[in-house]
């Protein structure tokens, strides 16, 4: 309820937007009760820090930077939605390039194995790549699930995300989620 009438910036149609709508719903508010401004993560952080918006939808290193700069976390999304990242190809691409898709999945599997077996080096590589310290990468690591297996909970989350997109006018037609998962 404390967000009523506030300006909130973040990326529309993303998991962060979905978290915002879920969080507002817990306080008996709707998106219309706030002024939502579509913007990327770095822009949202800059707008919040400059006072142009009251709150920002942030994730990963950008969220960590905001917290370290004194921002207060209103919600981390827990209990509102599951953060899910999928890799997708078109049915046509899959039919025309099955070996390439298999190779991609194998490389992904090998990368996850490397992370598990070379954790310290993974922290170092990631820190250098994203401009964080190893300690900051370690702090963010538990927020990510690198398991490529598509679980029933993942399918349910995709269904819920689709409902969110339809309800908010970002997807026109409902699709059968199970029919688009390659097994």
Residue ranges and their predicted role:
Residues 5, 68, 182:
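Phosphate-coordinating loops and pocket residues in cytosolic domains that bind phosphorylated ligands
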Residues 1-65, 120, 160:
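Bilobed "Venus flytrap"/periplasmic-binding protein-like clamshell domains
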Residues 95-170:
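Secondary-structure end/capping motifs
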Residues 163-183:
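Conserved C-terminal helix/tail region of periplasmic/extracytoplasmic solute-binding proteins
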Residues 12, 33, 57, 75, ...:
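A generic structural-conservation signal
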Residues 36-37, 42-127:
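Pocket-lining segment of extracytoplasmic ligand-binding domains
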């Amino acid at each position: 309820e404390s967000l009523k009438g506030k300006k909130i910036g973040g990326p529309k149609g993303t998991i962060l937007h979905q978290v915002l709508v879920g969080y507002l719903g817990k306080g008996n508010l709707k998106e219309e009760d706030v002024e939502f401004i579509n913007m990327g993560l770095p822009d949202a952080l800059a707008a919040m820090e400059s006072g142009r918006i009251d709150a920002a939808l942030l994730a990963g290193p950008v969220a960590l930077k905001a917290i370290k700069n004194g921002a207060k976390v209103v919600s981390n999304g827990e209990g509102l939605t599951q953060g899910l990242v999928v890799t997708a190809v078109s049915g046509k691409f899959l039919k025309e390039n099955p070996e390439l898709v298999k190779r991609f999945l194998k490389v992904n599997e090998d990368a996850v194995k490397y992370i598990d077996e070379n954790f310290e080096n993974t922290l170092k590589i990631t820190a250098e790549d994203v401009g964080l310290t190893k300690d900051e990468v370690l702090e963010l690591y538990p927020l990510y699930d690198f398991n490529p297996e598509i679980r029933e909970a993942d399918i349910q989350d995709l269904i819920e995300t689709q409902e969110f997109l339809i309800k908010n006018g970002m997807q026109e037609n409902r699709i059968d989620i199970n029919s688009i998962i390659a097994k």
